[in-house]
């Protein structure tokens, strides 16, 4: 059975909020958020979200191999826990639009497939509305071609442990060439 929240993320619902982001390979996404925002976020975890579940899916059956096989429609994502008194949804989303190419559909650099789509998965109706507004404000900066999907979070599965902090554990590991901080 899926959840909407990582089973291992540090998160206090009394003071923290969540956003789940898809911007290509989750290794690079996690690395960028930790490199630039680690002191301002509570925690983050990589996983798989907003795919088509079957009745037989369980946390152990939704895997990197299945997601990359292309038959699940899950996106590789980063779930971020944050205190809105420390960093806002707008700041997290502005950063999102600066660290990948949101104009490509189902790809980032050489990575192709629905698992690499650009997406913002909201954990509340208020966040859904705010994300749509922020996307519209970013449209002119990207030539009015942003392909980022904005949806409510439907489901979330933690990625396997070896994917967590992958580029910290494997400094020479693959990093998508579209993951860099743009001046905009």
From Swiss-Prot:
Specify the signal sequence span: none
Pfam name, any one: PMSR
Phosphoserine-modified residues are 58
Under catalytic activity, the entry for this protein gives: L-methionyl-[protein] + [thioredoxin]-disulfide + H2O = L-methionyl-(S)-S-oxide-[protein] + [thioredoxin]-dithiol; [thioredoxin]-disulfide + L-methionine + H2O = L-methionine (S)-S-oxide + [thioredoxin]-dithiol
Q: Kindly report, in one word, the top-level EC class recorded for this enzyme.
A: oxidoreductase
Q: Which GO terms describe its cellular component?
A: cytoplasm; nucleus
Miscellaneous: Present with 3070 molecules/cell in log phase SD medium.
Q: Which family does it belong to?
A: Belongs to the MsrA Met sulfoxide reductase family.
**Name the record gives this protein:** Peptide methionine sulfoxide reductase
Species of origin: Saccharomyces cerevisiae (strain ATCC 204508 / S288c) (Baker's yeast)
């Amino acid at each position: 059975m899926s959840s909407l929240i990582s089973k291992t993320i540090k998160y206090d619902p009394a003071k923290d909020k969540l956003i789940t982001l898809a911007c290509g390979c989750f290794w690079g996404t996690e690395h960028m958020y930790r490199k630039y925002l680690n002191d301002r976020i509570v925690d983050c975890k990589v996983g798989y979200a907003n795919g088509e579940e079957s009745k037989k899916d369980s946390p152990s059956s939704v895997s990197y191999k299945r997601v990359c096989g292309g038959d699940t429609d899950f996106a590789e994502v980063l779930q971020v826990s944050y205190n809105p008194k420390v960093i806002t949804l707008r700041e997290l989303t502005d950063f999102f639009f600066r660290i990948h190419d949101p104009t490509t559909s189902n790809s980032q650099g050489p990575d192709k497939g629905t698992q690499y789509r650009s997406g913002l998965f909201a954990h509340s109706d208020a966040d859904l509305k705010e994300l749509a507004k922020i996307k519209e404000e970013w449209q002119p900066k990207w030539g009015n071609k942003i392909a980022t999907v904005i949806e409510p979070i439907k489901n979330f599965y933690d990625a396997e442990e070896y994917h967590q902090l992958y580029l910290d554990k494997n400094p020479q590991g693959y990093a998508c060439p579209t993951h860099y901080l743009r001046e905009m």
